[in-house]
């Protein structure tokens, strides 16, 4: 009985400490985020997709200027004051130099479900919406959903398109789907 009271007291004490510290820690985090991105405009993380579909982080080679003439498929994560932006394109790596993400537009996405081997896949669709929004920045953006999901490190074999009126579920292999198929245009 005494031990239960002691543990209850410790739990409440730790909760109070956490609730006191958390707002200050979060405020510190936001302040640091603003300071970092006021000093540097953005941070670009660059990935190269080779012919076998393997994804390699080539950020250091990009910043050192070693890959200046490289052509291929690239995936870009751009961190700025507004958060993270995702982009993928085919072409020369120099296209990344002057890229600036565009303001987010709202799109009507179809109701979809990703699955891998019969099990549903947990994936934040906001990342895909962000990627779709930034596709306008490049003439030859990557549209193959299988490659986009591989860039996001998501293992997926099928996608289900779900319609509510009348209810239907159309299960399609992921290799046959383009990014634009996921949105109501």
UniProtKB/Swiss-Prot annotation:
It comes from the Viruses. This is Uncharacterized protein R500. It comes from Acanthamoeba polyphaga mimivirus (APMV).
């Amino acid at each position: 009985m005494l031990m239960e009271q002691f543990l209850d007291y410790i739990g409440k004490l730790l909760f109070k400490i956490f609730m006191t510290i958390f707002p200050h820690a979060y405020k510190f985090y936001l302040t640091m985020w603003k300071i970092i991105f006021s000093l540097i405009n953005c941070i670009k993380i660059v990935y190269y997709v080779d012919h076998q579909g393997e994804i390699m982080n080539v950020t250091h080679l990009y910043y050192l200027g070693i890959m200046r003439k490289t052509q291929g498929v690239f995936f870009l994560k751009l961190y700025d004051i507004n958060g993270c932006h995702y982009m993928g394109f085919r072409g020369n790596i120099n296209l990344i130099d002057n890229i600036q993400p565009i303001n987010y537009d709202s799109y009507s996405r179809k109701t979809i479900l990703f699955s891998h081997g019969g099990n549903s896949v947990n994936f934040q669709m906001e990342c895909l919406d962000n990627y779709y929004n930034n596709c306008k920045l490049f003439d030859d953006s990557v549209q193959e959903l299988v490659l986009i999901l591989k860039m996001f490190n998501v293992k997926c074999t099928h996608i289900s398109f779900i319609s509510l009126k009348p209810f239907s579920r159309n299960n399609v292999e992921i290799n046959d789907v383009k990014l634009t198929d996921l949105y109501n245009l």
